[in-house]
Curated annotation (Swiss-Prot):
Belongs to the SpoIISB antitoxin family. Keywords: Sporulation, Toxin-antitoxin system. Antitoxin component of a type II toxin-antitoxin (TA) system. Antitoxin that binds toxin SpoIISA and neutralizes its toxic activity. Upon coexpression with SpoIISA in E.coli normal growth is restored. GO terms for biological process: sporulation resulting in formation of a cellular spore. Transmembrane segments: none annotated. InterPro entries: SpoIISB-like (IPR048199). This is Stage II sporulation protein SB. Probably forms a complex with SpoIISA neutralizing its toxic activity. The gene is spoIISB. It comes from Bacillus cereus (strain ATCC 14579 / DSM 31 / CCUG 7414 / JCM 2152 / NBRC 15305 / NCIMB 9373 / NCTC 2599 / NRRL B-3711).
Length: 58
């Protein structure tokens, strides 16, 4: 029974170390998504501002 516990604990330790190596990929994907959202926000806000200005000028 003790051997099984040792095998399980070593398995989980290896798995945790592997997941930390891919963090840069996750960070890159998140920054891409944030950049896309910022572009969408800038585009939609500029349309709103343009409509508001045309209403004020009319």
């Amino acid at each position: 029974m003790a051997e099984v516990n040792v095998q399980k604990s070593s398995f989980f330790k290896e798995k945790k170390e592997e997941s930390n190596t891919d963090f840069s990929l996750v960070k890159g994907a998140l920054t891409e998504n944030i950049n896309r959202l910022e572009k969408l926000m800038n585009n939609s806000s500029s349309k709103y501002i343009q409509v508001k200005r045309t209403k004020e000028n009319a």
